[in-house]
Amino acid sequence: MTDLPDTDFTQRFIFDESDTRGELVALERSYAEVLAKHPYPEPVAQLLGELMAAASLLVGTLKFDGLLILQARSEGPVPLLMIECSSEREIRGLARYDAEQIAPDATLADLMPNGVLALTVDPTNGQRYQGIVDLDGTNLAECFTNYFVMSQQTGTRFWLYADGRSARGLLLQQLPADRLRDQEERDASWQHLTALASTLTADELLSLDNETVLHRLYHEEAVRLFDVQPLRFRCSCSRERSGNALVSLGLEDAQQLVVEHGGSIEIDCQFCNERYLFDAADIAQLFAGAGVDTPSDTRH
């Protein structure tokens, strides 16, 4: 295997004697970028890391060109977790929370009671798809496993861990019958491989490299590990997009906002905290059809 290109990547593997594939994800730099944007309490930071790991694994599983959006919503101390990951493996995320209601040892059920998990695939070309499942697992990994149980026949299992410094994940998924045609053999192989994966501890997945993880779990299996696929943090916000949002309000409302806000409107990106400032001259330019003045992108 070649040297790893970065701290953030996914890596696929397959079992030569079973109709099962797997994927591992490691996130450090992009995870740190997301956490640096807001002072997240530790339990919230852990959930964000787990959701980032899940999104990274899913982008490699759901073959499409476009954007994957994961949203967990609830009526509890964490009303929203949101991760976006593109097919180009660019990822960003955020959470909304009430810090005063979050205990250091809070569980998923404590943080997001009566919650739902929505998975949205927004392809560049084609129809948008969304699936929703209750947040009824003891952790996010169980919730994603439940989602796949409800939405498709293919067996899929997740293991997700994060500690505020790194986020890791493991996915196992059944493939169409090829090597094992007998259904009982397929079921037995699947149960065997997932049972071994369930022996993996959070400390092991968070601290060990992929080759060591796979050796510890499957040293008696024939496993092939493929090249890594890098990921990175990148926010898709821009001055142009912010300007388009103002145009959608209409000229009169946009001008009124400028007046109400003392001569300029400040639009903040919730993902990266970037700020875009628009004054009366900018509004006039937008509605004159000239678009956004590129040099003013530097104004925050």
Curated annotation (Swiss-Prot):
SUPFAM superfamilies: Hsp33 domain, HSP33 redox switch-like. It is found in: Cytoplasm. Under oxidizing conditions two disulfide bonds are formed involving the reactive cysteines. Under reducing conditions zinc is bound to the reactive cysteines and the protein is inactive. Its main location: cytoplasm. The keyword DNA-binding does not apply. Keywords: Chaperone, Cytoplasm, Disulfide bond, Redox-active center, Zinc. One of its GO terms (cellular component) is cytoplasm. InterPro entries: Heat_shock_Hsp33, Heat_shock_Hsp33_C, Heat_shock_Hsp33_N, Hsp33_helix_hairpin_bin_dom_sf. The keyword Chaperone applies. GO terms for biological process: protein refolding. One of its GO terms (molecular function) is protein folding chaperone. Disulfide bonds join C235-C237, C269-C272. Signal peptide: none annotated. Redox regulated molecular chaperone. Protects both thermally unfolding and oxidatively damaged proteins from irreversible aggregation. Plays an important role in the bacterial defense system toward oxidative stress. Belongs to the HSP33 family. PANTHER family: 33 KDA CHAPERONIN. HAMAP family: HslO (MF_00117). This is 33 kDa chaperonin.
